[in-house]
Amino acid sequence: MNDAPGIALSLPGIAVIGGGPAGLMAAETIRAAGIEVDVFDAMGSVGRKFLIAGKGGLNVTHSEARPAFDTRYRERAREVGAWLDEFDADALREWARGFGIETYVGSAGRVFPMDRKAAPLLRGWVRRLRESGVRFHLRHRWLGWDGDGRLRFDTPAGASCLHAGATILALGGGSWPQLGSDGAWVGAMSEAGIDIAPLRPSNCGFDVGWSAHLAQRFAGAPLKPVIARWHDAEGREHALQGECVLTETGIEGSVIYAISADLRETITRDGSAMLHLDLAPGRDVTRLCEALSMPRGKRSLGEWLRRQAALDAAKAVLVFEVLGSDAGNDIDRLASTIKRLPLRLLRPRPISEAISSAGGVRLGALDDTSMLRAMPGVFCAGEMLDWEAPTGGYLLQACFASGLRAGLGAVAWMQR
């Protein structure tokens, strides 16, 4: 995609800054109302993070029924729920059908396009937007506002300033900065007096501090299945079965991402967080003790754990990491550790490595149309807002829905 020629100093319609799902949905909504719209993006093409999300299969939304669906947004369930009232999972699936793309419900209720790919959907979407009259301006990095309130951009041709009838900011969070969502907008918006919660990693891994042996020999090894147990901010214990992966610095994977918000908040409050892993789901301590009490002869403890407790090498090395070389001397302790292996999580991985981010423009800084109370005519959408959700389609669903909300708000502003 090439830059549209020559940007006027004053746009007749609405400027959408950010070409991710939220920004593109806002642009579509605006154009459907007959209002001119220009989309600006810092990268050489739009939807780059959207394409990466589709690498392992594009999970566009989730089939979970509401209101349970809304609870996935934690303390922002009420506000995000209002967006979903206008564009829920069924609406998203019907929208995709408009491109000839059917969807299906896969494992654990996740919804995918039939071919599981992001590129066909993005290509069709951008084509339709262009045909409707949406103008794209690529490699235009937004820098904030000048003293006259005009939008400032760094462009291939140099600095540029322009005025628009309304502006929608859909600049993303702070994860995957190489794809455009680098969080650089925080400085400009803070200077403008916008209330912003610090950006933090979400759906992320955590550092543990392994021994050199584990870090060097078992990084990348999967742990499956396991049951993770952890405590929330109120001290309630929760359990979730799934899979995770050992890394050179700690642990990550789907079950860790799903509980990362609670773990991150505990670390913020207490300096670290305790995570317990059940390495042998389906077997109780008594049965494990009986199996491990059998004579093991000349077999190594690792081989014995594989035969008697069905622990692979990755799970066994975790047991040795916690109990040390004398792990087999106390069978009761060994069995208890297998069922509740303690890991002290030291810190979340950097936001640049996270799947998504928490924090951003506080929802209280917006009115019900997603317009900034402090800046009439400026709207916000997508991951740059202060909400978070687990993977599984919840992230994209809220981005689409918030883009629609901001688009409708900007249309109403222009038509007032």
For every predicted segment, state its role.
Residues L138-R150:
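A conserved short coil-to-beta-strand element within the FAD-binding core of flavoproteins
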Residues P12-V39, A406-V411:
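N-terminal Rossmann-like FAD-binding beta1-loop-alpha1 element of flavoenzymes
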Residues V80-D88, A108-R127, W176-S181, V208-S211, ...:
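Short beta-strand to alpha-helix junction loop
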Residues A32-A33, S45, R66-A68, D85, ...:
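Residue-level recognition of phosphate/Mg2+-coordinating polar/acidic sites
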Residues A15-I17, F40, W142, C161-P177, ...:
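Short hydrophobic core segments
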Residues R31-K55:
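Glycine-rich FAD pyrophosphate-binding loop
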Residues A26, W185-A192, Q397-Q415:
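An active-site-proximal "capping" alpha-helix that borders the catalytic cofactor pocket
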Residues A166-A212:
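Glycine-rich loop(s) and the adjacent beta-strand/alpha-helix scaffold that form part
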